[in-house]
From Swiss-Prot:
This protein's name: Trypsin inhibitor A
Site (Reactive bond): R5, I6
Family: Belongs to the protease inhibitor I7 (squash-type serine protease inhibitor) family.
PROSITE patterns to which the protein is assigned, alphabetical: SQUASH_INHIBITOR (PS00286)
């Protein structure tokens, strides 16, 4: 899978883009 905003800081999955989830404060 590809995540266009990997490593971006986040507090919840919705802070990331499609196919991304928030893991340990970063999108992945």
């Amino acid at each position: 899978r590809s995540c266009p905003r990997i490593w971006m800081e986040c507090t919840r999955d919705s802070d990331c883009m499609a196919k991304c989830i928030c893991v340990a404060g970063h999108c992945g």
